[in-house]
């Protein structure tokens, strides 16, 4: 599928500065950790953030495929964004991946991530829904129009469809 047009974050008023994203490099995507009761493990999450910052990561990405975002509840996703911003404490940029079952959910998650302090978003197609090109354009641009921070689209058709 080739998308010939899209709405960029810049078109929506977001302006990227090199300083927004550090010196460049690889942003690790964090894992989700759970305790023996199946709840998110805050201590393990914090330890992971400290480890990647101490190792020199120029930024951190969360809620990607490796985080098993599709297995997390909406509330768990919101919690991880909040924890990440608190634990990172503006030391490096935070990129939050947005995955929702539909546009309304994805838009709400994007706005929540922006409000929580994410520097940029990585958006995925709607979860478990097959979309044609026009529907994907509407979905992605609908999210982009709802936030003022930078947005990138994750392309992983073997996992996301």
Identify the role of each PLM range:
Residues 4-161:
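Active-site beta->alpha loop and helix N-cap motifs at the rims of alpha/beta catalytic domains
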């Amino acid at each position: 599928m080739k998308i010939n047009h899209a709405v960029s974050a810049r078109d929506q008023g977001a302006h990227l500065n090199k300083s927004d994203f550090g010196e460049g490099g690889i942003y690790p995507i964090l894992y989700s950790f759970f305790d023996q009761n199946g709840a998110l493990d805050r201590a393990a999450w914090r330890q992971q953030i400290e480890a990647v910052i101490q190792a020199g990561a120029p930024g951190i990405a969360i809620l990607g495929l490796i985080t098993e975002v599709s297995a997390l509840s909406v509330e768990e996703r919101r919690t991880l964004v909040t924890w990440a911003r608190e634990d990172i404490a503006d030391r490096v940029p935070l990129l939050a991946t947005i995955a929702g079952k539909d546009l309304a959910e994805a838009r709400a998650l994007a706005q929540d991530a922006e409000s929580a302090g994410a520097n940029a978003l990585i958006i995925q197609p709607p979860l478990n829904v097959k979309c044609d090109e026009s529907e994907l354009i509407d979905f992605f641009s609908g999210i982009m129009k709802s936030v003022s921070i930078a947005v990138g689209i994750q392309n992983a058709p073997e996992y996301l469809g």
